[in-house]
């Protein structure tokens, strides 16, 4: 236990929290340009072809972003918005593409959970 004099001379340092999304620089989203759009396979025991994009952000970071939903229109040089949120079975993928923003189209076949995929309300 430190004495009062020791604490006056050198106060206690606050614990530094490590962020899970360093490329966002404490921003909610970031804009970037796709440098490569490809599919990759998940870790065991899952099996699929997950759609991901390599993105060069406006702050200079280059990150891998997951493209959620069925089908997408992204290609190289597409301008997209990314948000935080990792994909548990894809190592190194810590970001998600925001559907329905900038060059990334929404999923037009969505009926439920539409807001997460940038889908408009159907005409019923």
Swiss-Prot record:
Highest taxon of source: Bacteria
Family label: Belongs to the universal ribosomal protein uS12 family.
Protein name: Small ribosomal subunit protein uS12
Keywords: Methylation, Ribonucleoprotein, Ribosomal protein, RNA-binding, rRNA-binding, tRNA-binding
Modified residues (3-methylthioaspartic acid): 89
GO cellular component: small ribosomal subunit
This protein's record includes keyword Transport: no
Source organism per UniProt: Shewanella denitrificans (strain OS217 / ATCC BAA-1090 / DSM 15013)
